[in-house]
Amino acid sequence: MDPKNLNRHQVPNFLNPPPPPRNQGLVDDDAASAVVSDENRKPTTEIKDFQIVVSASDKEPNKKSQNQNQLGPKRSSNKDRHTKVEGRGRRIRMPALCAARIFQLTRELGHKSDGETIQWLLQQAEPSIIAATGSGTIPASALASSAATSNHHQGGSLTAGLMISHDLDGGSSSSGRPLNWGIGGGEGVSRSSLPTGLWPNVAGFGSGVPTTGLMSEGAGYRIGFPGFDFPGVGHMSFASILGGNHNQMPGLELGLSQEGNVGVLNPQSFTQIYQQMGQAQAQAQGRVLHHMHHNHEEHQQESGEKDDSQGSGR
């Protein structure tokens, strides 16, 4: 027996598993700490993101307030800016041809809206409206509200204060103060007191008013403008100012009917009115010049008398 080989039955080394390395525990500890650090980092980032979102939402109202300050204060409701009248904000139904004609007139006249075109049409028909109703196109409620707000301001009608007066004494020029229909709204005068008859039958507007005796020559009506008074126009009736019933004017009927005849202003009557206005202006200017000349002569005469008295006193 070999004394050197004492451990014959020793297990070979390849059958034994190798011992674990010493650095493996350190690696596992590092991995575990890394996982823990990652888990710790995730909620911190979420919290940071949440804080950022909250801070951004806090800044948004500040930006809005700054924008509002730059744009200026908000305008209040403009519902009460205009005159309060009955029927305001009400829709008006009209025939299709009439609406189409108003739309066409708005484009032809260069108005901004159809309301301005309707206002223009009322302005053109002011004499007819006054003769038929006894008041102008401005509603009585608007006149009352404007008179209550400002006593010194008097709202005129759309035709520069067209005035009509009736001489109860039989047409004499020295009558009372003429009624201003544009300002007074025809107070004290009803429709029955005015002669009937202005508009003939027009399709779509019902039966017309009989046209007999419209402001006859003997009734003593006068027409005038503020600052002028033309008694001579009293011999002209509104029927002569407005075209007769048989004057067919195609294209001026607002497309309502080809047979209906709407009262059309007669240019010859307005020519006569303009001539009388010119004569009245000339007479007024002559009176003013005569008055000024008379005052100048009196002043010169007084100065001459003073000079004579001073010369005699010396």
Curated annotation (Swiss-Prot):
GO terms for molecular function: cis-regulatory region sequence-specific DNA binding; DNA binding; DNA-binding transcription factor activity; sequence-specific DNA binding; transcription cis-regulatory region binding. The keyword ATP-binding does not apply. Residues 78-132 form the TCP domain. The keyword Nucleus applies. One of its GO terms (biological process) is regulation of cell size. Residues 38-49, 77-89 have a biased composition (Basic and acidic residues). Keywords: DNA-binding, Nucleus, Transcription, Transcription regulation. GO terms for cellular component: nucleus. It is found in: Nucleus. This is Transcription factor TCP20. It comes from the Eukaryota. It comes from Arabidopsis thaliana (Mouse-ear cress). Interacts with PURA1. Interacts with SPL. Transcription factor that binds to the site II motif (3'-TGGGCC/T-5') in the promoter of PCNA-2 and to 3'-GCCCG/A-5' elements in the promoters of cyclin CYCB1-1 and ribosomal protein genes. Residues 1-91, 295-314 are annotated as: Disordered.
